[in-house]
Amino acid sequence: MASSAKSAEMPTISKTVNPTPDPHQEYLDPRITIALFEIGSHSPSSWGSLPFLKNSSHQVTEQQTAQKFNNLLKEIKDILKNMAGFEEKITEAKELFEETNITEDVSAHKENIRGLDKINEMLSTNLPVSLAPEKEDNEKKQEMILETNITEDVSAHKENIRGLDKINEMLSTNLPVSLAPEKEDNEKKQQMIMENQNSENTAQVFARDLVNRLEEKKVLNETQQSQEKAKNRLNVQEETMKIRNNMEQLLQEAEHWSKQHTELSKLIKSYQKSQKDISETLGNNGVGFQTQPNNEVSAKHELEEQVKKLSHDTYSLQLMAALLENECQILQQRVEILKELHHQKQGTLQEKPIQINYKQDKKNQKPSEAKKVEMYKQNKQAMKGTFWKKDRSCRSLDVCLNKKACNTQFNIHVARKALRGKMRSASSLR
C-alpha cells in the first residue's frame, strides 16, 4: 500500500514542479523543498530501528522505495537547476532592456542640445553682420537726397537772379533817360528780389534745422536700438549659459546613473556566479540542503530591493527628460521670435527706400514749407510704428520667460511628489 501511494505521488510532484518560462510565475514553497530534503536525507540504515520482518516481499518494497526516493532527489536537483537558469535569463533580459532605453534617451538629448547650440551661434553671427551694411546704405541715401534737394533749390533761385540782372543791364544801357518810371519799377523789382532772397535764406535755414533734427533723432533711435539689442543679447546669452549648465548637470547625472546601473549589474552577475558555485557544491556532496532556501530568500529580497532602486532611478531620469523637452520647446519659441524680429526689420528697411523715392518725386515738384512739415509728421508716425512693433516683440519675449518659469515650477512640484512617494514606499517595505 505504501508503494502504491508513493507511486501515485510521483506524477503529481513532477507536474507541479516543472517551471514555465513565464518570469512572473511563483516558485515552490520552501517548506515543501525542506521537507523533501529531510525525507531524502534519512539513510536506509535508520530504518534498522524498525522490527525486522522475515518476509522477502517487505525487503523488495523497501528497496523500491529507496530507489524512488533517490529518483525524487535527482528530479528535485534538476528542477532547482532549471529555476536558476530561468532566473539568469530574466535578469539578463531586464538588464538589456534598461540599458537600451537609457542610451537612447541620452543620445537623443545630446543631439537636441547640439542642434540648439548651432542655431544660437548662427543667429548671433549673422544678425549683426547682415544689418550693418543696410544701415550705412540708408544713411548715405538720405544724405544724398537732402544735398540734391538743397542744390536744386539754390540753382533755380540763382538762375532767376541772373535773368533779372540781365534785364536790368539791358534797360540801363538802352533807356537811361526816357524810361525813368521804368527805373522805379526796376528798383521795386530789385527790392522784391532781395525779399525773395531773404525768404530763400529763411527756407534754407528751416531746411537745415529739419535736417539737423532728423539726424539727431536718427542718432537717438540708433543708440536706443543698440542699447535694446545689447540688453537682449545679454539676456539671451545668460539664458543660454544657464540652459547649458543645466544640460551639463543632467548629462552628468545620467552618466552617474549609468555607472551605478553597471555596478549593480556586476554585483548581480557575481551573486549569480556564487549561487551557481554553491548549487554545484551542494549537488556534488548532497549535504547542507537546508541552508539553501534561506539564502535564496535573502538573495531574492536583495534583488527585489535592487530592482526597486533601478525603477526609481529610471523614473527620475524620465522626469529629467521631460524637463529637457520643456526647455527645448522654450528655446524653439525664442528662435521663432528672433526670426520674426529679423523679418520685421527687413520689412522696415524695404519700406524706407519707397518713402525716399516718394520724397524725391515731391521735391522735384518744388514743395512748400507746409508740405515739408507734413512729411516730417509722417516720418514721426512711421518711427512710432516701428517702436510699437519692437515693444510688442519684447512683450512676447517676457511671455515666454513667464511660461518657462511656470513649467519649471510645475516640474519641480511633480518631482518632489514622486520622490516623497518613493521614500514612503521604501520606508514601509523596511
Curated annotation (Swiss-Prot):
GO molecular function: DNA binding; DNA-binding transcription factor activity
Region of interest: Leucine-zipper: 303-324
Coiled-coil spans in chain: 62-102, 214-269, 316-351
Residues of the signal peptide: none
Principal cellular location given in the protein's record: cytoplasm
InterPro entries hit by this protein: Spz1 (IPR042961)
Subunit (UniProt): Interacts with PPP1CC isoform gamma-2.
The protein's name: Spermatogenic leucine zipper protein 1
Species assigned in the record: Homo sapiens (Human)
